[in-house]
């Protein structure tokens, strides 16, 4: 990227991650996205009218209404002139949104872009297929939108967990290794939470109703839920003889995350303080059923695009769609576990599909600041066979 104009991250913000039907389930994807965008804009020290464009991820858009990104932008108080585009690259949606935002600034189309993503899996509806033709005779079956559009391979019609089991077989991962990884993810997330290290979080206020005071949600729901004995005793979730279980996989969640991106000219003009500089990115695709290890292709592409070597990357955030995903990609890339997901990952924190790519960017900026490190990389797989990755430089 030596010949391309630099792009800076000047703020990060994410909501706490709510459990399925948990603390944030009363809030729509739009409401959560609006909170994240508003928080990011306020932290950046810019005015709402300074924002040129919004790229925002959302996967489970049924019932959300037209243009989720546009709704989130206006809900956050951005002006009606702001351009907004919704991105659906499954789990990588919000990281791809950040990549698109950076590219937009590099092309000179915009100077200030808000990018990220949102998801309320709790509010995803069930579908009644073919009802438009009339229910002529017999039962009508409801289709779960979370499964249909979020967690099922479109080609083989298998649950994502079947792909995780294939990953386990391909890379000789044991049940014990997956369980131990999940336990460590929870413990790291618990330690980071208690130490106040998730500085990217902005609280969500839930109206109390009937004269009751509003409830302020400030912590991730799932982090506290570790039960080691129960985790180790859990039955396989996807195959009778499998090793992937509910607790060694990411849960179903609600949440949103956003970053503010600016050009160098606007950074200087408005005297903004950069959080990080985007150094490079990469996307990759492979067989749909092996999407789990696509980050091992995308991350090296991002590092090469940044003009760096793997040895220069100090910390990684690899999205834990399953414990097996993190284990396999670390194995392929030869990474030291002490470098990866040091505040825990999505197994413990949660995985709202359209939010997670941006969530791991916000967490990485917190890690790099606290550890006084310079270079970090993120990678996230997505259903269909893909992954996206990004490399950033800490400027805090």
Swiss-Prot record:
Chain sites annotated for binding K(+): 186, 246-247, 347
CC per GO annotation: cytosol; mitochondrion
Protein name: Acetyl-CoA acetyltransferase ERG10, cytosolic
Acetylation is among the record's keywords: no
Gene giving rise to this polypeptide: ERG10
Cofactor field: K(+)
Residues given in the record as chloride binding sites: 382
Cystine crosslinks: none
InterPro entries linked: Thiolase, Thiolase-like, Thiolase_acyl_enz_int_AS, Thiolase_AS, Thiolase_C, Thiolase_CS, Thiolase_N
Entry GO MF terms: acetyl-CoA C-acetyltransferase activity; metal ion binding
Keyword field contains GTP-binding: no
